[in-house]
Every structure is written in structure tokens, then in C-alpha cells.
Amino acid sequence: MTDYQTIETQKEDDGVLVITLTRPDVMNAFSARMMHEMIEALDQADADDTVRAIIVTGAGERAFCAGADLSEGDKTFDYAKRQGEAAKPSAVNDDGSINWDSEILRDTGGILALRIFNSIKPVIGAVNGAAVGVGATMLLPMDVRIASDNARFGFVFARRGIVPEACSSWFLPRIVGISQALQWCY
């Protein structure tokens, strides 16, 4: 398959594609590049009739994914300030109306979550270590989630002063119920 920088893909003989997040030095922190690479890997898997299922896991034992890579500070959530990326077009149309289909209105975790949800192959999350923020929410649209004995999950959005992302406010209550989802998120 394709040569990636933030993930590795391994197609097993039994038709299982393993996608491994490969940034263990930063606890597999999620970046825009990782989102694009995961979407490309999912697209290729869906197009390959020999792939029967997809497993997503993280390299190393400390974390499946420790959340968004915040190493760029305020540039993390500002498309116009990101280095090495073209600024995304505005979501405001010439007449002042909002283009609600604009990708700029969707967080990167949400784009990935919807792509996982729309996968035509079963997607399994194999969690080893911490799954925090987008690391936890990317698991929600997966068909099966398997946790190792050292897996830990954190929905830390409210404690960070941000809203839950990656469609988690839609997926989480459907998995664990509204009461448990509210307790975990707030």
C-alpha cells in the first residue's frame, strides 16, 4: 500500500488490514496529516475486495492516541496560520450566507469519524494505553472496540474549555446512554 508518515498499514493473509498510528514518541498524537493518511488508507481498504476487516491500533504501550497534537499552539485550530498547509477557503459565500458543507466548519476528528462511520468494511479499534480526546472519539464510530488491560479513556473536553469534537456528542450517547455520556464528558 501507500507510504505514510504517521501511520503504517499491514495487510494480513486473512484479509485483515491493520492500521497502526506510528507516532509513539508523542503518544500517537493526532494531526491533520494523520487524518488525511487514515482517510486514504480507509478509502483504499474499501476499494480492495480482498480486505475483509480493518483494525486500528497505536504503536507503543503508552497510548493508543493521546488526543490532538497541540505542539503548534494556537495554529493547531487556525487553518490560516498552519505552516505547510494552504489556507482553506472561507465558509462564507459572496452573498454573506454560510456554506454549511464547507470542510472548514468540521474539525479534523469529525471528518475522520464520519469516514470511519461510512466505511463499508467492519472497523475494529484495538486500544492499548491512553485514548484521550480525539483518541477516544475516533473509536466511537468503529464497529467494535477492544481494550487491553492498560487501556484508559478520557473525554476531557469540558476540562479544557472546548466542546466535544469528532461527532462524539452524537456517537457516545448512542453507545453508552445519555446519562453515562454526560457523566463522562462533564
Describe the residue ranges of each PLM region:
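Crotonase-fold acyl-CoA enzyme core
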Residues: 114-186
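Glycine- (often His-adjacent) and acidic-residue-rich active-site loop
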Residues: 58-115, 131, 161
